[in-house]
Amino acid sequence: MMLYIVFILSVIFVIGFVGFSSKPSPIYGGLGLIVSGGVGCGIVLNFGGSFLGLMVFLIYLGGMMVVFGYTTAMATEQYPEIWLLNKAVLGAFITALLMEFFMVYYVLKDKEVEIVFEFNGLGDWVIYDTGDSGFFSEEAMGIAALYSYGTWLVIVTGWSLFIGVVVIMEITRGN
């Protein structure tokens, strides 16, 4: 049952990003991105990352809703265009969905999924418990590893978010 839930959430995740990439109006692009982010948090929660899923949901989606609410208010249209009105956008949306479904069928037709990534060199990330001496929370150790070993990742992520907000502000201010 859990496999089906993750599969359905993954399909909704991809459909949301296909909808985001073939948006006819900025309102629907933001909606597709927010839906995909929420479904992605659900996938993380399903795999046991309750803290990470909650933080992404609160911080990322909260920030996304503020940014997209502001940009939508700046670039609003009286009658926003939908997918059905523009035949080129509808064709791109349906083509992308068909390509995604054929890719899933091609991968799953043998009912075997091979390991795509091999995790070598996890010695720094493994939590060592000496038995009866105590309990280590995996989420707390993951956060500690993110800020100790992933310092540059946090810096690059913060800088990317800042540049994204600056670009969005420049685009909306130009109209």
From Swiss-Prot:
Any one GO molecular function term: NADH dehydrogenase (ubiquinone) activity
One cellular component term from this protein's GO annotations in UniProt: mitochondrial inner membrane
TM region positions: 1-21, 25-45, 47-67, 88-108, 149-169
Biological process, per Gene Ontology: mitochondrial electron transport, NADH to ubiquinone; mitochondrial respiratory chain complex I assembly
Chief place where the protein resides: mitochondrion
Topology relative to the membrane: Multi-pass membrane protein
InterPro entries for the chain: ComplexI_Subunit6, NADH_UbQ/plastoQ_OxRdtase_su6, Nuo/plastoQ_OxRdtase_6_NuoJ
Subcellular location: Mitochondrion inner membrane
Enzyme class label: translocase
Catalytic activity, as annotated: a ubiquinone + NADH + 5 H(+)(in) = a ubiquinol + NAD(+) + 4 H(+)(out)
Its EC number(s): 7.1.1.2
Gene3D superfamilies: NADH-ubiquinone/plastoquinone oxidoreductase chain 6, subunit NuoJ
Domain of life according to the entry: Eukaryota
UniProtKB keywords: Electron transport, Membrane, Mitochondrion, Mitochondrion inner membrane, NAD, Respiratory chain, Translocase, Transmembrane, Transmembrane helix, Transport, Ubiquinone
Family that this chain belongs to: Belongs to the complex I subunit 6 family.
Protein role: Core subunit of the mitochondrial membrane respiratory chain NADH dehydrogenase (Complex I) which catalyzes electron transfer from NADH through the respiratory chain, using ubiquinone as an electron acceptor. Essential for the catalytic activity and assembly of complex I.
Assembly: Core subunit of respiratory chain NADH dehydrogenase (Complex I) which is composed of 45 different subunits.
Record's protein name: NADH-ubiquinone oxidoreductase chain 6
Organism: Bos mutus grunniens (Wild yak)
Gene this protein is translated from: MT-ND6
